[in-house]
A protein has these predicted regions:
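Short secondary-structure boundary/capping elements
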Residues: 46, 74, 78, 105-106, ...
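Short, charged beta->alpha transition segments
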Residues: 46-55, 79-83, 106-114, 139-143
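Alpha/beta enzyme core
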Residues: 83-84, 88, 115-122, 128-269, ...
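An N-cap/entry alpha-helix motif that binds or orients negatively charged groups
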Residues: 1-55, 59, 339-358, 368
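Active-site cofactor/substrate anionic-group-binding motifs, chiefly glycine-
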Residues: 54-106
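Short, intrinsically disordered C-terminal tails of secreted or membrane-associated proteins
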Residues: 364, 368-371
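Internal helix-turn-beta structural module
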Residues: 304-343
């Protein structure tokens, strides 16, 4: 274990809570999309159903507490508060990277939450790059077993590793090793980015490798280049990290691209999702679940109840949005079209962009997307 690992985790929490770690000009992109209001929904608000099945588990709402922390005393308290809230509300939870606990068993208790959340969908988490630094399928299995998880998240964070003074940056041949983990584990494997987004091309590769789901983790929420800028040890490191503040694929665009690339794979939308209307838009664009991190981290520094209140507000907003578009359940919401207010259509592959002439549509400033 690198001796700085617990301190790095503590730094990440402190910086995320105390500093401006937002993107400067990039947003998650959901403001570009608008639902068509339905004045005659023909359903009862009380009958709106937000439940969803994900990896064989039933959730009361399409929400996941995104992987955040562990490995520190504060991480233990935060994880327990998040888990108790997830248990009460009926949503899933991802843990922070378990690498620290694998290499220092005394840290395991900072991750264990099954005693306070026996029924939740719980996902273990490791950095995929560790498969190039001695980790094997057995390490992945141990990570799952030690926290009694229902699945494993492998996170991809090449840019973050490149910006960390202690980063591990050999990502060569990693796809084959991810495939080996998918074949070798008895539980589902989810692959996620950490805030810069998954492209369509990467999504196809991962789908072919056998992953059970993808978390696009797009740009627009916490900028981890900003976090690493605050951790930088010299001027050069700060300058390099600062240059990448607005790097990445916005979450809304990542969801659209990945859904088109892998039509049948469950998708988690995360990165800058802050309310239930954005959750509704993400589902209409192709997501199965939405992951939320920083708003719940802030709440978890206060109490279990604060996390419950934030989560309940998001779920209530989602239910009202579904009612306002006449969607009785999430399947209907997924088929609900959105109006794209910008005429600019990004194609992330090759960084091409295209615009339509006014003659291509009755409106040059909007178009309908997302119906499936």
């Amino acid at each position: 274990l690198r001796e700085d690992h617990p301190q790095r985790k503590a730094d990440h929490i402190r910086i995320s809570l105390e500093e401006d770690v937002s993107f400067e000009t990039v947003t998650a992109g959901f403001e570009r999309y608008r639902f068509v209001h339905c004045a005659l929904p023909e359903i009862s608000l009380a009958a709106v159903d937000t439940t969803v099945s994900f990896l064989g588990r039933r959730l009361e709402a399409p929400l996941l507490v995104s992987s955040m922390t562990g490995g520190t005393p504060q991480g233990r308290e935060v994880n327990c508060r998040l888990a108790r809230a997830a248990q009460e509300v009926g949503i899933g939870m991802g843990l922070g990277s378990l690498r620290a606990a694998l290499e220092d068993p005394t840290l395991l208790e900072t991750y264990r939450v099954r005693d306070v959340a026996p029924d939740i969908l719980l996902l273990a988490n490791l950095g995929a790059v560790q498969l190039n630094y001695g980790y094997t399928v057995d390490h992945c299995r141990r990570a799952v077993e030690m926290v009694e998880a229902d699945g494993l998240i492998l996170h991809l964070n090449p840019l973050q590793e490149a910006l960390q003074p202690e980063g591990q940056t050999d990502f060569s041949g990693l796809l084959r090793k991810i495939e080996e983990v998918c074949r070798g584990l008895e539980v589902p494997v989810i692959v996620k980015e950490v805030g810069w987004g998954l492209s369509a091309d990467v999504a196809r590769l991962l789908a072919d490798a056998g992953v059970a789901a993808l978390d696009v983790a797009g740009a627009g929420g916490t900028s981890w280049s900003q976090v690493e800028m605050y951790r930088a040890q010299n001027g050069l490191q700060r300058a390099v990290a600062a240059a990448f503040r607005d790097w990445g694929i916005p979450t809304a665009e990542a969801v659209r691209e990945v859904r088109c690339a892998v039509p049948h794979l469950p998708i988690i939308a995360s990165g800058g999702i802050r309310d239930g209307i954005q959750v509704a838009k993400a589902i209409a664009l192709g997501a199965t679940l939405c992951g939320i991190a920083r708003p719940l981290l802030v709440a978890a520094t206060e109490s279990d109840q604060a996390v419950v209140e934030v989560t309940t507000a998001i779920i209530t907003q989602l239910r009202v949005a579904m009612f306002a578009v006449g969607a009785p359940d999430l399947s209907a919401l997924a088929r609900t079209p959105l109006v794209e207010e910008s005429p600019l259509s990004y194609r992330w592959r090759g960084m091409r962009a295209s615009t339509r002439s006014p003659s291509a549509s009755s409106s040059a400033s909007s178009r309908t997307v997302g119906s499936r």
